[in-house]
Amino acid sequence: MPKTLNKGQQAAADGFFDFLFSGDKEMIISGPGGVGKSFLMGYLIDEIMPRYEKMCSLLNQPVKYRDVHMTATTNKAAEVLAQATGRPCGTVHSFLGLKVTDDFSTGVSKLSKTNNWKVHQRIILFVDESSMVDTTLLKYIREAMLECKVVFVGDHCQLAPVKETKPPVFTQGLPMYVLTEPMRNNGQPALMAICQQLRDTVETGTFNPVQVVPGVIDLL
């Protein structure tokens, strides 16, 4: 049975298909938790990649991208993504062959190349929780991706990495598809409303009082 996408997911899926044939090297899928980002990533691999290969065949073009790798910025995020999609997933640092060293005097983690560092060619790399990609990590990702496609997945309203004012990925002017339709809490309108209210606060800087809904949202 084919998987069903909502309107925002479908727009992102169509955008990903076009992205594979475009000259763009990077794109973004953004949205809060519970809007189906992990589901969409699985769909792009299971449904859009085969469609891309068929189109290449019809156009008598070589299939440029076959290998797809799923990564995340933290071990926990990688574990969650692996469970959600049923696919192998590790940290982007491990995939690139980077060593993370914590500098407790500054609170900033330092990155350095290990013997496992390599430059990849003609792959598709997903980077989940990409709001945590700082300027240095973004530089390494770009250095390691030769004729590759990178899909940054995350939430542009999340906190920026340490010592950054905004998540660098979201300041690059990259093509971005924003998912807004809640899939996880869609049976609880009150929870959906407060989540949206908090996001609006991040984006506008204006905070409105939380509306109490007995049994769902209570003040302690």
Regions found by a protein language model. Give the residues of each.
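Conserved helicase motor core of P-loop NTPases
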Residues: 15-20, 24-25, 49, 53-56, ...
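Walker B catalytic acidic pair
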Residues: 128-129, 154-156
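Conserved lysine of the Walker
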Residues: 37
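Inter-Walker segment of RecA-like/P-loop motor cores
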Residues: 68-121
